[in-house]
C-alpha cells in the first residue's frame, strides 16, 4: 500500500499503535485477573496466618480470583494441593467475608502442617477431635468425605476454630523440626 499524503500515513500508524497498545493492556489486565495472587491488601491477621504457613510449613498460599486454579465450583472455598504443596484460596467464593477467610486459611494451612510437618498424620487424639468439632462439621464429615480422610479433616476443622495466636503457636510447634 502506498501513501500519497503524509497525514493519512500518520493517522494509520497512530491508529495501529494505539490499537496495539490498547489490546496489549486489555490482555495484560485479563491475564492479571486470572492469575492467583499473593495476599496483598488483606487484613493483618490473615497476612500473619499466611506468612506463618508459608514460612513454617514451606507451603505457598495463593489467592485465585474467578474460576481459575481449581476453583471451578462456586461452593469450593479453598483447598490444599499436597502434590503442589500449595494452599489455594478461592477468593471470589469467599464473598468478602473476613471471618470465613480466616477460618478457611487456618483449615487449609493445617492440612499443609499435617502433610509437611507430621508425615500426613493428625496431631490431636480422638477425644480431642470429638469434643472440639461442631455438630455441623460432624455432619459434613460423614456426608462429604471418605472414611480414610475423617481424622485429618476433623482435625483441620477443629484447629481452624482456635484463636489465631494459639493456631500460629501450633503451626510453629509442629513444623519446628520439618525436614
Residue ranges and their predicted role:
Residues 2-17:
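N-terminal Sec-pathway targeting helices
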Residues 23, 48-51, 57-59, 122-179:
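Metalloprotease/metallohydrolase-associated module, dominated by Zn2+-dependent proteases
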Residues 32-57:
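Short N-terminal segments immediately surrounding and downstream of signal-peptide cleavage
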Residues 109-125:
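Catalytic Zn2+-binding segment of zinc metalloproteases
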Residues 68-99, 115-116:
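Active-site scaffold of zinc-dependent metalloenzymes
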Residues 35-40, 90-95, 99-100, 142-147:
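Second-shell loop/turn segments in exported
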Residues 15-28:
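Hydrophobic membrane-insertion alpha-helices, especially the h-region
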Residues 98-113:
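Short alpha-helix carrying the canonical HExxH Zn2+-binding catalytic motif
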Amino acid at each position: 500500500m502506498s501513501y500519497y499524503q503524509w497525514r493519512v500515513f500518520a493517522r494509520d500508524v497512530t491508529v495501529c499503535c494505539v490499537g496495539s497498545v490498547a489490546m496489549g493492556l486489555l490482555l495484560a489486565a485479563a491475564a492479571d485477573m486470572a492469575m492467583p495472587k499473593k495476599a496483598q491488601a488483606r487484613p493483618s491477621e490473615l497476612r500473619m496466618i499466611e506468612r506463618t504457613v508459608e514460612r513454617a510449613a514451606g507451603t505457598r498460599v495463593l489467592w485465585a480470583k474467578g474460576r481459575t486454579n481449581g476453583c471451578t465450583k462456586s461452593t469450593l472455598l479453598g483447598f490444599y494441593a499436597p502434590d503442589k504443596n500449595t494452599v489455594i484460596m478461592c477468593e471470589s467464593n469467599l464473598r468478602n467475608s473476613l471471618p470465613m477467610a480466616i477460618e478457611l486459611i487456618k483449615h487449609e494451612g493445617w492440612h499443609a502442617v499435617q502433610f509437611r510437618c507430621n508425615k500426613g498424620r493428625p496431631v490431636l487424639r480422638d477425644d480431642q477431635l470429638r469434643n472440639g468439632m461442631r455438630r455441623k462439621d460432624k455432619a459434613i464429615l460423614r456426608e462429604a468425605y471418605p472414611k480414610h480422610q475423617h481424622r485429618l479433616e476433623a482435625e483441620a476443622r477443629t484447629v481452624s476454630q482456635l484463636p489465631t495466636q494459639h493456631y500460629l503457636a501450633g503451626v510453629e510447634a509442629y513444623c519446628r523440626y520439618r525436614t
